[in-house]
């Protein structure tokens, strides 16, 4: 499984980072970055479901 963030869709709200700080971090550009794309996938799925713009995808 892989976790990805669509930087064009990300608005930098920080929901993903708050839910999964080991997986996501807001970068210098204010957009979410994936720190560990293959770690804590249940948490990453929760973040994807909570992302207001649908910028996070979890591919199985």
From Swiss-Prot:
Protein name: Ferredoxin
Keywords carried by this UniProt record: 4Fe-4S, Disulfide bond, Electron transport, Iron, Iron-sulfur, Metal-binding, Repeat, Transport
Cofactors: [4Fe-4S] cluster
Pfam families: Fer4_15
GO molecular function list: 4 iron, 4 sulfur cluster binding; electron transfer activity; iron ion binding
Residue span, 4Fe-4S ferredoxin-type domain: 2-29, 30-60
Residues involved in [4Fe-4S] cluster binding: 10, 13, 16, 51
Organism placement in taxonomy: Bacteria, Thermotogati, Thermotogota, Thermotogae, Thermotogales
């Amino acid at each position: 499984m892989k976790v990805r963030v669509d930087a064009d869709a990300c608005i930098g709200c920080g929901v993903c980072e708050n839910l999964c700080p080991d997986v996501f971090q807001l970068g210098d550009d204010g957009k979410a970055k994936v720190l560990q794309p293959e770690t804590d996938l249940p948490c990453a799925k929760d973040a994807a479901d909570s992302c207001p713009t649908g910028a996070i995808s979890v591919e199985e």
